[in-house]
């Protein structure tokens, strides 16, 4: 069983994922890897800690609650249905994505979080015993659109603030807000972990990587950017723990050297202790959309814990 370690580095408030076709953005420096997902977690983490020194302690408390809820079996019972509010910010006609494209993303979330994705059965035998049907559903609640003169929004949450030209979140303690805009810097999307301000809570996805139709662009055109980011919103870490042979705070995922890109050939062995086969098809890795198609049971438990009584997202589980 993988040792689970809790550290300040692993407790990131915000995770920002990128398609590193460019080497930098106005907000975060990234390393160029053409057509690869990438992450500027370190820079964003430092910025959030500078702005909110109390954040680390708050997230450690959420982690303690999560561990206790899992250990004591205090997970939410029954199905959880999450209303999704989509906020579209557009400068061009292409950025003003269609309702069809938006609904295609909701459909992907429902399939991926319920083990109904067509590639779910591709999970290798070695991991078939831990692949999870999370049992969380998503319903499109509303779509708000706003024309803008901005060519890109960056990663400082401007798209979430009407005073900065964005759209304020709608009922963020009971509805998942999803902003769709051009982020810039090659960034695909980012999410706020449980514990952050409700004024900025939710997920941001670049319009070119949302859903499966319209402007969705390969190799990130199967809606898995949102699946990955909603995983972060539900308290999941990257599977490699954001450091070499790190911990994602989940016991049934193997220890990864680092992020995986593209669609790795199976089996792909880690050089970490024990040389485990890496779970490259996990939604919390960095493979192409076609290369990721499972959550683990341990990840399911982490997600369900935050919706339990006393959990940081319990308000979403109320009737």
Where are these regions (language model features)?
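Bacterial signal peptide processing site
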Residues: 18-21
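Metalloprotease/metallohydrolase-associated module, dominated by Zn2+-dependent proteases
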Residues: 23-26, 205, 256-319
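Propeptide-to-catalytic entry region of secreted or membrane-anchored zinc metalloproteases
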Residues: 25-172, 308
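Stable alpha-helical elements in mature extracytoplasmic
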Residues: 98-105, 222-226, 299-302, 312
């Amino acid at each position: 069983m993988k040792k689970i370690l809790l550290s300040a580095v692993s407790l990131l408030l915000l995770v920002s994922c990128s398609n590193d076709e460019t080497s930098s953005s106005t907000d975060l420096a990234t390393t160029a890897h053409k057509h690869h997902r990438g992450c500027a977690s370190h820079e964003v983490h430092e910025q959030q800690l500078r702005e909110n020194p109390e954040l680390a302690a708050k997230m450690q408390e959420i982690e303690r609650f999560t561990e206790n809820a899992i250990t004591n079996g205090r997970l939410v019972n029954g199905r959880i249905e999450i209303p999704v509010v989509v906020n579209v910010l557009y400068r061009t006609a292409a950025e003003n994505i269609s309702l069809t494209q938006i609904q295609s993303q909701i459909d992907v979330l429902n399939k991926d979080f319920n083990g109904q994705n067509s590639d779910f059965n591709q999970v290798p035998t070695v991991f078939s015993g831990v692949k999870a049907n999370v049992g969380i559903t998503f319903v499109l609640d509303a779509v708000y659109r706003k024309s803008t003169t901005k060519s890109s929004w960056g990663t400082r949450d401007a798209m979430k603030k009407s005073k900065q030209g964005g759209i304020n979140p709608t009922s963020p303690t009971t509805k998942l807000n999803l902003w769709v805009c051009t982020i810039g810097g090659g960034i695909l999307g980012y999410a706020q972990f449980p514990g952050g301000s409700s004024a900025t809570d939710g997920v941001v996805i670049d319009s070119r990587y949302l859903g499966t139709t319209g402007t969705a662009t390969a190799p990130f055109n199967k809606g898995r950017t949102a699946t990955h980011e909603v995983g972060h919103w539900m308290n999941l870490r990257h599977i490699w723990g954001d450091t070499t042979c790190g911990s994602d705070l989940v016991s049934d995922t193997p220890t990864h050297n680092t992020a995986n890109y593209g669609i790795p050939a199976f089996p792909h062995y880690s050089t970490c202790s024990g040389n485990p086969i890496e779970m490259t098809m996990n939604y919390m890795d960095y493979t192409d959309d076609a290369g990721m198609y499972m959550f683990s049971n341990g990840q399911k438990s982490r997600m369900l814990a935050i919706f339990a009584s006393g959990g940081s997202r319990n308000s979403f589980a109320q009737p």
